[in-house]
Amino acid sequence: MAGNVYERELRKILSGEREFIEKMVKTFSEEERSLYLKITERPFLVLRAAGSFGIDIIAIRDDFSFPIEVKSSIYEVFRFTMSNGRAQEQIISHMEITSRAGIFPVYAYRLKRVKGDPWRLFAPPGMQVRGNMALIYRLLPKLETTGS
C-alpha cells in the first residue's frame, strides 16, 4: 500500500470515525481496543497539510496542535538514512520550524503486517516545548540517534 493509505487511516483514527475504528480494532487486545475507541469521545480536527514542507497532517484539539509526519515499513526500526538522507534533512527542518511555535513534530510510524496495534508515535529528541504540549512531549518516546 502507498503511504497515503496509512495517512488516511491515521486521519480516520484521530478524527474518531467510530465505524472505521471498530473494524480496525477487531483483532486487537481488549486494552488496545478500549484505548482506540476512547478517541471517539474526544476526536481531533484533522487537516491534511499541503505543500512540500513534509508534514502530512495536523491534528488539533483544545490547546494541542500536532504536525504529524506519517512513515510506514515492514521493519520494526525506521532508519532515516534509508532514503538517502532526505528524511534526516526533513526532520531537522521540521524541528527548526516547529520549535519557533513552541510545538514539536510527531512521527507516526505504521508497522505493516503486524497483529494488534500497528501505530507507534515518536517525537524528536532535544526539543524546547512550552505549555501543555510539554506534557505530551515528555510522554512520547523520542527518536533515537546514532553516531553516524
PLM features per residue range, with description:
Residues 17, 60, 100-101:
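Alpha-helix C-cap/termination motif
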Residues 45, 49-71:
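Active-site beta-strand-loop-beta-strand hairpin of nuclease catalytic cores
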